[in-house]
A protein has these predicted regions:
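Short, well-ordered beta-strand segments enriched in hydrophobic/aromatic residues
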Residues: 53-61
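Membrane engagement elements in two modes
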Residues: 1-52, 64-66, 71-74, 82-109, ...
Length: 150
């Protein structure tokens, strides 16, 4: 079972640490979204090729943001390309079954996982939000590509 406490996944009573890549941060206005990743060879196999990764995404709004900047996450999209060039696109409503609402100074953080058939893959991701002050106004937040390595 996977538990996560303060940035450290705990799996089978072992403590692991996420890799925080300073390049893998999306920023738009008052919104910052850093991504941290971790390869877990303990849950991976060579035959068949099955490489397990977990990741942590933190969505935060500056404490100095105006109240009308409050938003809700509506939609997520990601495109995963493995080392052989195979591509998979996934999209859905919310993230991990939730539609977080974030306002000034607030943080929403979630942990998820993925498996790949090659030792490295890269992911392109974006989220779509709507602002409460103007329901018709939305924002697309794109992430830099981030790479998964075993």
């Amino acid at each position: 079972m996977l538990y996560c406490r303060e940035g450290f996944p705990i799996i089978r009573d072992q403590i692991f640490r996420y890799v925080h890549d300073p390049v893998c941060v999306a920023m738009t206005g008052d919104i910052t979204v850093p991504v941290s990743t971790l390869s877990l060879p303990e849950f991976s196999s060579l035959h068949p090729s099955h490489y397990f990764f977990t990741y942590q995404i933190r969505i935060e709004m500056s404490k100095d943001a105006l109240p009308e900047k409050a938003f809700q996450l509506d939609h997520c999209y990601w495109r995963i390309t493995n080392a052989e060039g195979d591509m998979e696109e996934v999209q859905g409503s919310g993230v991990v079954g939730e539609f977080p609402v974030i306002s000034s100074g607030q943080i929403y953080e979630y942990t998820s996982c993925s498996t790949f058939s090659t030792t490295s893959s890269y992911m392109k991701r974006y989220y779509t939000f709507h602002f409460f002050a103007s329901r018709a106004r939305s924002l697309m937040l794109s992430f830099p590509d981030y790479i998964w390595h075993v």
